[in-house]
Design a protein with these regions (language model features):
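Acidic catalytic/metal-coordinating carboxylates
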Residues: 35, 61-64
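Short amphipathic alpha-helix used as the core "switch/output" element in two-component signaling
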Residues: 63-74
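Acidic, metal-coordinating helix/loop segments flanking the phosphotransfer/catalytic sites
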Residues: 32-50
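Conserved acidic carboxylate
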Residues: 8
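Receiver (REC) domain active-site loop signature in two-component systems and cognate sites
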Residues: 57
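Active-site residues of response regulator receiver
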Residues: 54, 82
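C-terminal output/effector regions of signal-responsive regulators
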Residues: 136-167
Length: 167
């Protein structure tokens, strides 16, 4: 089982994430934290593999929590689930090791994809001690191939999207 901590200050959104999580096999909720401090407390009490992290929270925000976790060398993965759609925030979270980023509001299917991809990768990482370049490439680029088939929003071209992500 993958142990999950939800960090979300809005109780309704936290409950929604909890219900979504309960519909996906292989994940066990260890707690819901509504603040920076309560997240650190739960992390100290339980072994957590994955944090579903909101950015906008009162007091210290989710980005500050992510920064703190990396400063402490915490070996915990993070999927950001936030209304923060500013590119600089997205890029910072990815630089600090977020494995995925969902912008609120989102559909269950996108949530499910993020967690299923995470579960699949954890299975690969836990069953391999070494990987060949071919195996690694298949793992790293599997998601890219799937997302290229997704229809882009009106007015957004593949080349514009590549420019945004490369900046």
């Amino acid at each position: 089982m993958i142990n999950v901590l939800i960090v979300e200050d809005d109780p309704m959104v936290g409950e929604l994430n909890k219900r979504y999580l309960s519909q996906i096999d292989g994940f066990q909720l260890k707690g819901i934290a509504s603040s920076f401090q309560s997240a650190l407390h739960i992390l100290g009490e339980h072994h957590i593999d994955l944090i579903l992290l909101d950015i906008y929270m009162p007091g210290k925000n989710g980005l500050e929590l992510l920064t703190e976790l990396r400063a402490q060398n915490e070996a915990v993965d993070v999927i950001v689930i936030s209304a923060a759609s500013e590119l600089d925030v997205i890029k910072k979270t990815l630089r600090y090791g977020a494995v995925d980023y969902l912008i609120k509001p989102f559909e269950f299917e996108r949530f499910q994809t993020a967690l299923s991809d995470y579960r699949r990768k954890q299975k690969v990482y836990s069953t391999h001690r070494n990987m060949s370049q071919k195996e690694l490439d298949a793992e790293l680029f599997q998601k890219k191939e799937a997302t290229e088939k997704v229809q882009l929003p009106k007015g957004l071209t593949k080349s514009t999207l590549k420019l945004i992500w490369s900046s």
